[in-house]
């Protein structure tokens, strides 16, 4: 149970019933204490008798230790106690089936007192938990029932519970004082909040939901401290000063900036503005990038006073603020750029020179890319003349051409009309764009060079393997059967590019595939003899279950294929 017991919600009948139950509890406790006290007296008396019998040990062997009657074989047999180890008769002993023995009356009473009193347990509870449930209930109901003439708590309850009444009273008063204080604090806080809400309710109509929380915080602080609020004219002056200070290189403190922005938004909300009027008036102002645009808009808003009329005008002005401000910001920079673009300055000249230099650099990079592409195409043609067939090169060449086409298109493509129609763009923006273009072209050139190196590595790998490549001018179908090899020799030797082909070239073209096929198809023993053919009528052919080291396809090649040199006329 907690430190404080609140029974104030109970009715009078319920409180009376609980009081009676608690009183019965105390009566039962008193009776139990009296019973245990009588048992303790009996134990003391019998313990004195045992002290007398302890001197005469021989008497215990013939007489009972409690009633001092002689033992009888059938009527009063001798039994030994488990605790005191003295002999007693059957009438003065109690059976103990759990321990399979007997206990004399004094030892049995001692166990009952020990189990009933539980002095060790109550002592532990008193030391650890100094307040019990019944005592707390009595304490809480005592004052309530005493006023109505109820009974008072009996003095018997003060065994260990009534010792802490004063401490409980102090704790109760402290516990009652804490919720009262907390309630007072909460009420004071809520009162201030309600005051702030009531003061700001008239001003909340002018604040949109997306405004920064700085002015609201200042309003709440002002309402709490009771200081008067500053006038709108002073706020406008502060805003104009901060806008003048907020040049492209200068940035005010974040708190001041938020205050100025919030004040400017309040002014713009109360003023009905039109896009045409804002654009025309913006022609007479010097527009600067960054915070300068905001300062010019604030000046415009300060020139035209607010029309505090009906609520409909305020709503329409609040709804159209975002669109009007956007159109004004779009119109003013463009017109200022047209005004300043007709007068060339030193910055414009530097800008033109930088543009020319960057264009020359990009053209130089594009020329390098074209030359590297031409070198790659020449190497491809040389590789195609050296080898018979390759499937990767026809797919790689279009990729190179496509990449080169992309680079040339990107380099030769003129600027769009939007870029030409914007003479007032800053040098930094154009420099960044040109740097991006240079980086793109450099990456494309690097990609082309990597593709060329990949083609070179493939050609070197094919040369190391001993394969030859034929030109891919006219793709010809090739038969998989080696019996048509003489026809292919004649066709491959006489290409449209090389009509007067010599027979030595034809032999060179076909020697490498023949050697490879012979190398991979012949058994290891027949590799020493170049002119030996496979004997189909050999004595040893092997069993059906034994695997031939050469595949069946290889056997067919041996049986039908012959050296190219022997087939020539």
Swiss-Prot record:
Zn finger spans (FYVE-type): 58-112
Region Disordered: start-end pairs: 143-430, 490-569
Any one GO biological process: intracellular protein transport
Pfam families tied to this protein: FYVE_2, Rab_eff_C
GO cellular component: a single term: melanosome
Entry's Gene Ontology molecular function annotations: actin binding; myosin binding; small GTPase binding; zinc ion binding
Keywords annotated in UniProt: Coiled coil, Metal-binding, Repeat, Zinc, Zinc-finger
Family annotation (InterPro entries): FYVE_2 (IPR041282), Intracell_Transport_Effector (IPR051745), Melanophilin_FYVE-rel_dom (IPR037442), Myrip/Melanophilin (IPR006788), Rab_BD (IPR010911), Znf_FYVE_PHD (IPR011011), Znf_RING/FYVE/PHD (IPR013083)
Domain of life: Eukaryota
CDD domains linked: FYVE_SlaC2-a
Biased composition (Basic and acidic residues): 352-362, 379-390, 526-535
Residue stretches in coiled coil: 431-465
Bias (Polar residues) ranges: 404-415
Protein name, as recorded: Melanophilin
Species this protein is from: Felis catus
